[in-house]
Every structure is written in C-alpha cells, then in structure tokens.
C-alpha cells in the first residue's frame, strides 16, 4: 500500500497536520498521517474542526520542489473524486476549500506550509465526516459507517492523486472539472471579509474566485464565502 510515501496510523492525535510536520521534516519521502480521532483539529483561519472517532482525519506532507498554485482547490477536487469512487457519493465543492453534501458541510481542506532549514514543506489536511451524531445538525456527513478497508482504499487512492499534484503532474483541465462540481456556479454569494455580494462565474488561472457585479468582473484571492441555503 505504501509505495512512494511513509504511512502512520494513530488512534488519537491532537492535529494530523501537526504530526505530519513533525514527521516530514526528517524524511526524504512523502508522509501520510491517518487518525481515528482528532482532538484539536482546525480549519482555515484557525477555526475549530470537530473530528470525533469514526470519521476521517488525514494529512499528506511533502517537500516543495516548485510553486504550486490553487492547491486547496485541486486537493478538494481529488477528495471529491475519491469519495465518489470509494463511497459512491456525489459531493460538491464550495470555494475555496469546503466539501458539501445535501447542502451541508461534510469536510474541508487545510493547506499549511512551514520552512525547516532552507526547505519548504507543505501539508494538505483533509477532514471528512463519515457519520456524526444527529444532534450536531449544523454539520453534515455522508452517512457511511467507518469501515477500515474502505478507508484504506480511500487513503491509497487519494494519496496517489495528491502525489501527482505535489509532483506537478495534475490534470491541466482541472478547472473545468472543479466548476462542473461547484455547488454555487452562477449563484449569488457573499464575500465574508468585505460582505460584498457577487455572482460567482468562474475561477482565475491561479484558482481565484471570479465574481460579477453590475457588469464588472471582480477577482477574490483570499476569503471565505457565504452561499444562501448552505449550512
């Protein structure tokens, strides 16, 4: 299973991303971390991400050999495709890093980078709710029980695709695939940090959000967005 990367499985960790950084700084190979439970998970902007036992907490770490653009979007597309193949669920994508199923967030992507010595390292963190308690209704899940064989297949498939991203070999037509699976294509959205309302119409060459307002195109590089009707 572990050709081309070192794999570590844990019962419980604080953060799979933190563990991944500790491992990758002393490794020549790529590193994958999987935990059955994560007690101090986080999302973008240090938001807390609950990762109780029975879900997927995963991190993929590598040494940067080149500048990688739109990494969060590409990783999200990989996760979406792997969930479709392994679990037969049609998950949608929300810019820039959320996974949506039945109008609720069921997971997300967190990209973090650190420099050790002169070498930049990047970790792609992935959190996915397989099945959560019904009282946590503000989150969604894909309503699948934890079966380690399926999780193992998912990890292998996802890791091989993330290796392609890390090595600069990702599908050149990925933006069309991403847009075809976007949950808010041609929908009105709100930019969280400015409260500006735009119509989402596409992506820039580096993964920027392209919005339309009063006939003028706007490019958003960094923010979260709100979409009416989603969680």
Language model: regions and residue ranges:
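Active-site proximal loop and beta-alpha junction motif in alpha/beta enzyme cores
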Residues: 7-9, 95, 129-131
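A short coil-to-beta-strand element that immediately follows conserved catalytic motifs
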Residues: 31, 90-94
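Short loop/edge segments at beta-strand edges and connector loops
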Residues: 11, 93-95, 172
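Long, positively charged amphipathic alpha-helical accessory segments at protein N-termini or as interdomain linkers
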Residues: 2-3, 65-67, 73-91, 101-231
């Amino acid at each position: 299973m572990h050709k081309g990367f070192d794999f570590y499985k844990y019962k419980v960790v604080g953060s799979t991303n933190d563990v991944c950084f500790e491992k990758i700084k002393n490794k020549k190979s790529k590193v994958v971390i999987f935990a059955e439970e994560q007690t101090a998970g986080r999302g973008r902007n240090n938001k807390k991400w609950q990762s109780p036992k029975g879900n997927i907490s995963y991190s993929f770490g590598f040494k940067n050999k080149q500048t990688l653009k739109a990494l969060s979007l590409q990783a999200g597309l990989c996760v979406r495709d792997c969930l479709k193949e392994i679990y037969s669920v049609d998950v949608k994508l929300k810019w820039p890093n959320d996974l949506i199923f039945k109008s609720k967030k069921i997971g997300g992507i967190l990209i973090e980078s650190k420099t050790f010595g002169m070498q930049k390292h990047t970790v792609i963190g992935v959190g996915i709710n397989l099945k959560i308690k019904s009282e946590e209704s503000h989150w969604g899940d894909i309503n699948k029980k934890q079966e380690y064989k399926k999780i193992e297949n998912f990890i292998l498939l996802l890791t091989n695709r993330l290796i392609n991203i890390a090595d600069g070999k990702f599908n050149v037509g990925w933006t069309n695939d991403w847009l075809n699976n976007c949950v808010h294509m041609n929908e009105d959205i709100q930019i969280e940090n400015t409260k500006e309302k735009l119509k989402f119409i596409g992506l820039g060459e580096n993964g920027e959000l392209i919005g339309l307002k009063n006939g003028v195109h706007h490019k958003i590089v960094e923010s979260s967005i709100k979409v009416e009707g989603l969680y």
